[in-house]
Design a protein with these regions (language model features):
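Acidic, low-complexity/disordered tracts enriched in E/D and polar residues
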Residues: 1-41, 45, 91-93
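Long, charge-rich, low-complexity alpha-helical segments
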Residues: 32-94
Length: 94
């Protein structure tokens, strides 16, 4: 499982943006297009290559007034999935 101190960032060539034509958020990767769900969008909006996973979890738990453990499970699962798809890279914090 991914450690909470890992820092997620978008891989080179990956763009996360709002597509006005489709009226939704999209992830553009080399030769790939992903349409993340609402939960993934909330997570990805906090991915900046600086924040640790724990910080992202804390922000979302406070924003949605939800149990931190549940948020952590969702965030880690989403980031691990996106990492396997080549969208996100997870770097150990130093």
């Amino acid at each position: 499982m991914t450690a909470g101190s890992a820092i997620p960032s978008f891989r080179r060539g990956v763009k996360f943006r709002f597509d006005t034509t489709r009226d939704c958020w999209i992830i553009l990767a080399p030769e790939k297009l992903f349409m993340p769900d609402e939960i993934a969008v909330e997570i990805l909006q906090l991915v900046d290559g600086v924040r640790e996973i724990d910080t992202i979890v804390d922000s979302l738990a406070a924003r949605f007034d939800a149990p931190r453990d549940e948020i952590a499970t969702d965030v880690i699962a989403a980031l691990e999935d996106l990492s396997e798809r080549g969208v996100i890279q997870l770097t150990d914090a130093e």
